[in-house]
């Protein structure tokens, strides 16, 4: 079974740090939608953002929580440096280069935010168990991630080209995410939407993915020849486009969770 290679994730996002904002239309849409679920406050909170990237959602956190202490965490040093340049110096900001699964601070957080990051973590149950341990009681998590219909056109086209060929990582269904998070949290909100992108061809689509550092981070990624790309483009275009464009579906999930004292209680 293919698993996500964290070292490759780091390398890919570091290479894409400078071009990320030019291609990150989906991530910007997700940030705008996620912000709808966030109620700001002038109170001082301890806040963690997981996967701050170039600071797209970080800017929204700063605006909504101007008096809070905010830790911005990302696995990629280059992403963190880009976020620093964008956000500027602030005594309320602390930048951390770390994999969230290895992050074990002494303090607890009141709020955890994450935009378009959790899809890069294989074991979602383990992730949310860990996030539970980082939150104070009554603390909340608000996040966006990618759902199971993301890039379904690419997966179907690849399967038609070669049934053994796998390219993009597995994305979860909303009901699967609900089942995972309901074990430890009270679910305050759960929603999904779709963002359709259009590209001239498959190469342009994959170039855009590479531009944000999101090119496949699977450890069993196989190389494509020019002939395979040409064949893939024809299959994709015939099924999910026309002579001018191809359609790319992004299935987006949003959730808000609250940590409760009885983590094993069957909450309603």
Curated annotation (Swiss-Prot):
The gene is bioC1. One of its GO terms (molecular function) is carboxyl-O-methyltransferase activity. Pfam families: Methyltransf_25. This is Malonyl-[acyl-carrier protein] O-methyltransferase 1. Pathway: Cofactor biosynthesis; biotin biosynthesis. Gene3D superfamilies: Vaccinia Virus protein VP39. It comes from Ilyobacter polytropus (strain ATCC 51220 / DSM 2926 / LMG 16218 / CuHBu1). It comes from the Bacteria. It catalyses: malonyl-[ACP] + S-adenosyl-L-methionine = malonyl-[ACP] methyl ester + S-adenosyl-L-homocysteine. Keywords: Biotin biosynthesis, Methyltransferase, S-adenosyl-L-methionine, Transferase. Belongs to the methyltransferase superfamily. Its EC number is 2.1.1.197. Signal peptide: none annotated. One of its GO terms (biological process) is methylation. It is an enzyme of class 2 (transferase). Converts the free carboxyl group of a malonyl-thioester to its methyl ester by transfer of a methyl group from S-adenosyl-L-methionine (SAM). It allows to synthesize pimeloyl-ACP via the fatty acid synthetic pathway. InterPro entries: BioC (IPR011814), Methyltransf_25 (IPR041698), SAM-dependent_MTases_sf (IPR029063).
């Amino acid at each position: 079974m293919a698993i996500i290679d964290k070292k490759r994730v780091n390398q890919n996002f570091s290479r894409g740090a400078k071009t990320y904002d030019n291609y990150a239309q989906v991530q910007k849409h997700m940030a705008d939608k996620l912000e709808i679920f966030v109620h700001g406050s002038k109170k001082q909170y301890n806040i963690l953002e997981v996967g701050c990237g170039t600071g797209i959602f970080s800017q929204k956190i700063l605006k909504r929580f101007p008096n809070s202490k905010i830790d911005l965490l990302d696995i990629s040093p280059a992403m963190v440096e880009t976020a620093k340049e964008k956000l500027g110096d602030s005594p309320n900001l602390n930048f951390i280069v770390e994999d969230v699964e290895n992050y074990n601070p002494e303090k607890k957080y009141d709020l955890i935010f994450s935009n378009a990051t959790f899809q890069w973590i294989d074991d979602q149950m383990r992730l949310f168990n860990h996030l539970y341990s980082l939150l104070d009681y009554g603390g909340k998590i608000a996040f966006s991630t990618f759902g199971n219909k993301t890039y379904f056109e690419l997966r179907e086209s690849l399967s038609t080209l070669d049934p053994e060929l796998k390219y993009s990582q597995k994305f979860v269904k909303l009901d699967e995410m609900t089942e995972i998070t309901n074990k430890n949290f009270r679910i305050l909100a759960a929603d999904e939407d779709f963002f359709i992108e259009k590209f001239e061809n498959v190469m342009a689509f994959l170039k855009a993915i590479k531009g944000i550092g999101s090119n496949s981070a699977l450890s069993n990624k196989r190389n494509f020849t020019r002939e395979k790309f040409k064949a893939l483009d024809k299959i994709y275009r015939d099924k999910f486009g026309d002579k001018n464009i191809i359609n790319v579906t992004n299935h987006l999930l949003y959730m808000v969770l609250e940590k409760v004292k009885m983590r094993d209680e069957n909450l309603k």
